[in-house]
């Protein structure tokens, strides 16, 4: 089934087209495409609010219940580990299960377990509390993986020629979820206690379920012949996976560490700690649609966005503390400024990765359809989860051992290495293409001369 409103059928993203065609197609949205956007926006907003609500107050609450910083980091990190495993499964079987059913069921379970997280303060402290935190987070991770994998597949199917633009535009709602989650959670916690933030957000997500059941179109496709293994063993995809890992680990690193650092360093109340996260989320939400549009309109600039975005991110983490060897005094305004720059650099790096992987898959013989879109969506979600597991787990451990300043600098090394590796790959790829073009130019010149000789005689 071709994308609605696209008579030419799906084509690899980033293909040539008339100037302004991407913008024109987005103006001529069919009803189904409009409903897809609403559904994807709802899952982005709801899931990111549920994910980010923990930041301002949960680490402090967990400490009261007997959890160490390392355990708190693992509670954040286990979410990503099980999202990784679930994304690989759901991405491979999205055609068999059905994208719409996977989407709706994922949202329903996510809303329910968010409410369950709100009653964990009634659980006895110590091992029982820690075990229940892990159990509820794992259930939430699996449901979130189902909804997001299905959402990305449906979006790429509905908008085959504007993947980066649409994904980038919908990051507004992811950013809005990240923006609203911490301050809403912090102020509800400060005003009404531990339970209400989770119950409120869980109910909001559950209210979105019947809406999506009614409006989300049902896409069907035949199962494909390719596998995750073939996709991830492509050299370019392997490096893009490393980029995704590094960026998600940078975000995940901040979850268990930044709120504790701000509380200790600047003595802010829990409600205001959430506002510190605002700079990162707001700049990411605003910049992502712009980088998405740029990626679709000028596909050749994606490589530079990826490389420079990673290098800027590395610099941000060196200055986040800042690292002691720079002898720069830590100040709240500087921290917020660095988070704003990090949000922009993250948008530069994250948005081009999905269309780059999809283009690479098409170039290497993967069929165009929901099956390949499911593989790419599942791979993206799974590899994001790898970094999101390592980031908070390693971040919590390093924070405990060497402090936030050095831990952030070490985290920045990952982004630096991935940016340099991606840049080196693109340079080598460009030189290989130039060498390949030269013999073809020589052959075509000789053929032209041969064709002209009889006429000259």
Kindly give the residue locations of the regions a language model identified:
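Hydrophobic core of transmembrane alpha-helices in multi-pass small-molecule transporters
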Residues: 128-146, 331-349
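Conserved MFS/SLC helix-loop-helix module at the cytosolic interface between two early adjacent transmembrane helices
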Residues: 85-124
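Residue-level signature of mid-helix packing/kink "hotspots" within the transmembrane helices
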Residues: 80-88, 178-179, 281-285, 289, ...
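Helix-to-loop junctions at the C-terminal end of transmembrane segments
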Residues: 86-98, 189, 288-300
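C-terminal ends and interior cores of transmembrane alpha-helices
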Residues: 108-126, 311-329
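C-terminal membrane-cytosol helix-exit motif in multi-pass small-molecule transporters
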Residues: 202-221, 421-426
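Extracytoplasmic gate region of multi-pass secondary transporters
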Residues: 54-56, 238-277
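Cytoplasmic helix-loop-helix junction between adjacent transmembrane helices
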Residues: 134-174
